[in-house]
Each structure stands twice: as C-alpha cells, then as structure tokens.
Amino acid sequence: MYTTGLIGKNINYSESPEIHNNYYKKNNIPFFYKIFNLKQDQIDDFIKNLHKNNIKGFNVTIPYKETILQYLNDIVYPADKIGAVNTVAVQEDKLIGYNTDYIGFIKSLQYYNIQVKNFKCLIIGSGGSAKCIYYALKELNARDICIVSRNPEKARLKFEKKVKILNIKDENKLDRYDLIVNCTPIGGPNFKEQKPIELKEIKKNCVVYDLNYTPKRSKLLKEAKENGAFIINGEKMLIFQAYSAIGLWCLNGIKGGR
C-alpha cells in the first residue's frame, strides 16, 4: 500500500482525502490519501522521509505551491512556465513536479460549457493559483487578462511584463469583465466572513469563479448571484485535478514501482 496526500497549512477542511480514497477503492488502486498539515520549517523533514514513509506522490496547496519548487528534480510543462506546482510524483531518485490545477481549471470550464475565447478576465490574487489560472486563460485565448493584488509591486515580479497588474483597491470598474476568478483564500474555510473584492457593478451574465469550494457558496459567490452572475466554486476543478494527479502517480507507482 502506497501513501499519497496533501501538504499545506491549516488544511483540515480539505475534501481531497474523500475524493482520492473513494477513487482508489472503486478502482482497486493500492493507495491511501491523507492530510499533512505542515509548517514551513517541517517541509525539509517531510521530503527527507518520503521513501521511509512509502509516499508515492503528494499534492501541494496554500501556501507552498511555489515553495515546493526548490525540492524538485524536474518540473514538467506547463508547471515550469507557470512557476507553481500542486502535484509531485515520487520516483526512486527524483521528485517530479506537475500542475494539475491547470488541467482541472480548463476541464471545469469545459464541464460548464464556458468558452472564454475573447473574454475580458479579472484574476484576484497573485500567488501560485493565480499564475496557474493566468496561463490557462492565455491557452484558451482570453482576449484581455488583468490581475489585482494587495501588493502589485511584488506581483509584477511573478508575471510577464506585459500583464496588467493593479492594486486591488484601485479596480472598481468590474462591469468590463466577462469572467472574474478569485484565486485567494479569502472567502474560503479560514476566511468565511470576508470577500476579496466588492461586486457592486458587474456585467450581466458575467461568470464569477471562486476557486474556494468550502463553503459551497462563498460571500463573493452569493453577492455575484444576487447581481445576476453565473457562479462556480472550485469543487469540479478539485475533482478534475485529483483524477489527473492519480493518473500520474499510478504511472509512476504501479507501473514504475520501487
């Protein structure tokens, strides 16, 4: 039996163990999935003991999607371009990084039949998830992508020079956007009573996507719905990225073995 899991900070709310373990059981995969709540100074020991603990792969969430890069031997496209990894496969002598969030986001849009070609898009946040969503929207030929951040100067170091980056306090013309994506933890399980931005005026039929999936309808999504938006939470993205990660681990684990 191989161990897989999720590393992050304050992540006991995660639905990943249920999704993964149900899939393993249904498909007779000899894996088990668990939560690894880690402080940053515990990551070194976690990595050193991967083989000892029979860990074949793991997912990475807030706030370590960029931190994990320093531990990897190889980073597979598009994770190398994005600069963030959320899935790691453990081989005999290598750690291979992937970004299955990228795949999960694109598949979730396909699931809801949302075509973002020529869309004007607003990304809230500038961390690893935001970078992933930015490159996914570029791949899907979104016409214009703007990023808002609490720290735009720091955010500019993470993105292409041509990307429009604004202070979140200065962006109040939301009716120009066809798609708004929240890539911050604000509104999620650790910040349920907060919103990352006010949605006072949004375009009719705007799509508002909150990557948080707990609660199912965040304060941001509730306000968006009241203003006529089509709303999506991060649950389908979570499921699709999980299945993609499992495929990578099975390829390395069951077929490659140790």
Curated annotation (Swiss-Prot):
Residues annotated to bind shikimate: 14-16, 61, 86, 101, 213
Record keywords: Amino-acid biosynthesis, Aromatic amino acid biosynthesis, NADP, Oxidoreductase
Enzyme Commission number, as recorded: 1.1.1.25
Pfam families the UniProt entry points to: Shikimate_DH, Shikimate_dh_N
UniProt-annotated catalytic positions: 65
GO annotations of cellular component type: cytosol
GO MF term list: NADP binding; shikimate 3-dehydrogenase (NADP+) activity
InterPro entries: Aminoacid_DH-like_N_sf, NAD(P)-bd_dom_sf, Shikimate_DH, Shikimate_DH-bd_N, Shikimate_DH_fam, Shikm_DH/Glu-tRNA_Rdtase
Protein role: Involved in the biosynthesis of the chorismate, which leads to the biosynthesis of aromatic amino acids. Catalyzes the reversible NADPH linked reduction of 3-dehydroshikimate (DHSA) to yield shikimate (SA).
Family under the similarity heading: Belongs to the shikimate dehydrogenase family.
Name this polypeptide is given: Shikimate dehydrogenase (NADP(+))
UniProt organism field: Clostridium botulinum (strain 657 / Type Ba4)
